[in-house]
From Swiss-Prot:
Residues with attached carbohydrate: 95, 105, 166, 178, 357, 365, 382, 387
Protein name per the record: Pre-glycoprotein polyprotein GP complex
A Pfam family assignment: Arena_glycoprot
Effect of residue 2 to A: Reduces membrane fusion activity. No effect on GP complex formation
Region (HR2): 360-423
GO cellular component, one term: host cell Golgi membrane
Lipid attachment points (N-myristoyl glycine): 2
Lineage: Viruses, Riboviria, Orthornavirae, Negarnaviricota, Polyploviricotina
Amino acid sequence: MGQFISFMQEIPTFLQEALNIALVAVSLIAIIKGVVNLYKSGLFQFFVFLALAGRSCTEEAFKIGLHTEFQTVSFSMVGLFSNNPHDLPLLCTLNKSHLYIKGGNASFKISFDDIAVLLPEYDVIIQHPADMSWCSKSDDQIWLSQWFMNAVGHDWYLDPPFLCRNRTKTEGFIFQVNTSKTGINENYAKKFKTGMHHLYREYPDSCLDGKLCLMKAQPTSWPLQCPLDHVNTLHFLTRGKNIQLPRRSLKAFFSWSLTDSSGKDTPGGYCLEEWMLVAAKMKCFGNTAVAKCNLNHDSEFCDMLRLFDYNKNAIKTLNDETKKQVNLMGQTINALISDNLLMKNKIRELMSVPYCNYTKFWYVNHTLSGQHSLPRCWLIKNNSYLNISDFRNDWILESDFLISEMLSKEYSDRQGKTPLTLVDICFWSTVFFTASLFLHLVGIPTHRHIRGEACPLPHRLNSLGGCRCGKYPNLKKPTVWRRGH
C-alpha cells in the first residue's frame, strides 16, 4: 500500500520527462487495446455465460431484446362483485352438483329432480315478466329471477310457462320450470340445457331422456366456499343480449377513458394497480393504451377495462335508481362486452385448446422509453397458465411490433419538427461538400507554368509559353499545368 501511495506522489515528477510520458501513453494504449481485443475475442462473454447458465429468469426481468422485457398484469375481480343492490350477478358450482346464483341481496340455489313442488291448479302460472310480481314481495328476488330466465334463453311469449308460489303463502319464494325431455317439451328442455351450459361451465345435466325433470330455484344463503368466477358472470351478461337489447346500437364502436376508484374522469390515464390490480407498483396504462383500445376492439384486455370502467359508475347510480334503470344497466353492459371474444374463448375451452379467462395479461415493456404494447390475454390450458415458451412467437412478434411502432412514431415526430426545405438544404450541401472534397483530393490544375521557372502571375501563358494577353512574345518554351503558385 505504501508503494502505491509513493508511486502516486511521484507522478507529477516523472511526467516532466518526455520519455516517461511516451511510456505512459504506450502503456495506456496497450492496456485499452488489450481489453478491447479480449472483449472482441468473446472471453468475457464466455465467463458471463458460465456464471448465468442454468439460472431462471424472473418474469419481471425476462429479456426479449436489448431494451424490451416480458411483463404481466393481473386483475383483481373483487371490485366487480360488491354487495350493492342490483349489482353484477355471481354464479357458482360446488362439487359439480350444487348450483348457486346471486344478484344484489338475493341468492338462489338451483336444483333438478322429479318431485313436483308446485302445481298449476294451486300456484301462479308465469307467462309474462309482469306475472313475477305475484311470486315475491322482494324486488331483488323478482329482478334476479327475470334476469336468470332471460340468460338461459327463455322466451316469455313463445316458450312454455313455468310456476311460482304465491307470495301470500308462508312457505316462501320458489319457482319451478319443467325441463323434461319428453313430448312437446323436448325442444325447450334442450334449449334450457344449452343455456345452463353457457352459464355454468361445470353444469351437471341430471335430466334423463323420457323422465320427469323439474328445475327449482329457491332463496338460500350464499356459500362462503363459492369462488368469484367472473367468467361465468361475463357469460351470464351476454346470454341475455337478444332479449334485453334486441337492437344493439353501439356494437363496440365508441370511445372511452379511464376513471379512478371514485368515478372521477382522468383523461390522462389512471394507474390500475391502485384499485383493481393484484400486482403492486405496476405502471400506468394511460392515453396510449386507451387509444389502442379505441382502435382495436378485438382484445380481451380492452373488454376488461371497459367492464371495470363502467361498473364503478353503474353501481353508484343504481343504488338510487328505479327498476327501469336497472334494465338499462344490463343493456349497456351487454353492449360493452365483446360477444365474439367471449364465445370464441368459450368454444376454445370446450375444445380443450388454450383460452382466455380475463384474469392475467402479458405485454412487452420498453425499459428505456417506458412505452409498452397493448396487453394480451395469458391463455389457459388444463386449468393452468401456459408457459412463456409456449407462446414464444407471440411475444417476439409483439416486441418487433413495439419497436417498429416506436421507430415510426419517432420518425413522424422528427418529420413534423424539421422543415423539408432544411432537410433538402442539408442533403444538397452534404453532396456539394463531398463533391468538393473529391475534387480537392484529385487536385485539378488551374494554370500553366514555364517548366523550371517561377509562376508567371499575373500573366496567363499559352501553350507556346507566351503571354496570352499579347504583351510578351511567344518564347516557344515547354509549359506544364500547375495548381499551386
